[in-house]
Amino acid sequence: MSKEIRFSSDARQSMLKGVNTLADAVSVTLGPKGRNVVLEKSYGSPLITNDGVSIAKEIELEDHFENMGAKLVYEVANNTNDIAGDGTTTATILARDMIVNGMKQVEKGANPVLMREGIERASKAVAEVLLKNSHKVETSRDIASVATISSSNSHIGELIAQAMEKVGRDGIINVDESNSFDDELEVNEGMQYDKGYVSPYFVSDTDKMEVEMDNPLILVTNQKITNLQEILPLLEQVLKTNKPLLLIAEDYENEAISSLVLNKLRGAFNVVATKAPGFGDKQKEMLEDIAVLTGAKFYNKDLNMKLSDLTIEDLGTIKKVIVKKDNTTLIGHSSSEAVNARVEELKTQLANTKSDYEKKTLKERIGKLSNGVATIKVGATTEAELKEKKLRIEDALNATKAAVDEGIVVGGGAALVEAYEELKNQVRDTNVDIQKGINVVMNSLFAPLTQIAINAGYDEEEIVSIQKTAEKDFGFDAKTGDWVNMFETGIIDPTKVTRSALLNAASISALFLTTEAGVTELPKKEEPQQPVMPQGGMY
């Protein structure tokens, strides 16, 4: 396949068009008066959303160089989503601003390698200021405020705050569809462990890259499954029940994984394999907890129990299982009495142990078994509304968890402007090109506030000018048009979200500016069609 190669300004300018196209589509969603974007889906109804990463993911441009530029900015949004779970639109806006202004300097002859040094230095300095200015999330009201800002819906904010109150700040909260038109909060017994599927080929929902199973059978063992022959009698029994199967084992040989995946893809049976959490004695204890929760018999290798002896009676079951890349959530229980008895047993151990490590481990296990799993059930009148609402709640939930991790800063883009005012005379360098890189980051700190003002229909230059001289913690409420104390009004952002958005934007921008060549595949030339000869003979 032939390739097209473009160099220096030609390559960067082509990719910049893609950056602008993607950023234009994403930036309209920012702020309390941000709009939605409609995404065509290959099946089902269109998706209406204001989620930056969902929009960026769908953008594919015809021109290969423009598409490369768009995909680079998508990486900013995606990485921010992976780290913080929200802030993807802010990350995209920051990245575009840094790239556009950085390009202007490079085109004028600035050294992009030295500019990169300035970009990295300034972004780290801003990130440190954000952490310094961060406030701990202390009240349920703080949690509700973060969720409300992220979802633009006070009802959703209250629902998430209630969920965290019931299962704890480190508890498990899932989002599911409701059978009614109303939103509901449901709390079940259950737990989560930090191991996901052993192969992505087990995934049934490719959008979320996860597997959901209702009422699955569950095998719990600390043994290694080497091939399907040793559990074949069990699989044949499971097949007759027509129920899905979750395997939790210490490890799997590649042969066993390949056989399971092949049977899953062929539709022979619905199965997902995960590794057992923990190591050594801790692994055995956690598997015993899972066995109690699910009603399974723990097949312990230390007791010389053979996998070939397994029967369907040895398997447990549970209301629902959600398996993701890095974790598995078990929702429900087989017996409340058994779970309560297990919790009491662990509490007795906790009272008798003197080891700080053991105390910490036992508290974690008690918390996992006793706090349960909260499920926010989303109701809506149409499929399109349901999809959009679910995305909003998932974003708000991620933002809230990020706030619990690192605290909160003033929202509405004000935190970045405050960081600018604090650092504008501190982050300096005598090297002209390094200073230009610093300026690229510093000047980009106004971009989110600027876009919020534009989306709300206000004069962005006036808003930014007032924000620069505003009292600390005061900012612009784009919903009402008032200048308010952001913490008192509940206009706050998770520090982790804002910090991750900035650092990811700076990272990709620096790489973009140091790009000197681009290589893409040439579009295939369509073969000229042969003329069709008329049918029939002579008359």
Task: Describe every region a protein language model picked out.
Residues M1-Y43, M538-Y539:
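N-terminal, positively charged regions that mediate nucleic acid binding
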Residues S14-D24, E66-D82, E236-L239, E364, ...:
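Short, hydrophobic/aliphatic alpha-helical segments
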Residues M15, G31, G85, G109, ...:
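Residue-level signature of catalytic and energy-coupling elements of molecular machines
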Residues V26-N36, A77-A95, S152-E177, G372, ...:
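Conserved phosphate/anionic-ligand binding catalytic regions in large, soluble enzymes, centered on
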Residues S45-N81, V198-M209, V220-P233:
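Glycine-rich oxoanion-binding loops at beta->alpha junctions
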Residues E60, E66, I376-Y539:
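Extended, low-charge hydrophobic alpha-helical regions
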Residues Q105-I149, E212-N215, D309-H333, R428-E488, ...:
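A structural-propensity feature for long, helix-poor, extended segments
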Residues A127-E406, V410, P523-Y539:
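Long, structured protein-protein interaction/assembly regions in large complexes
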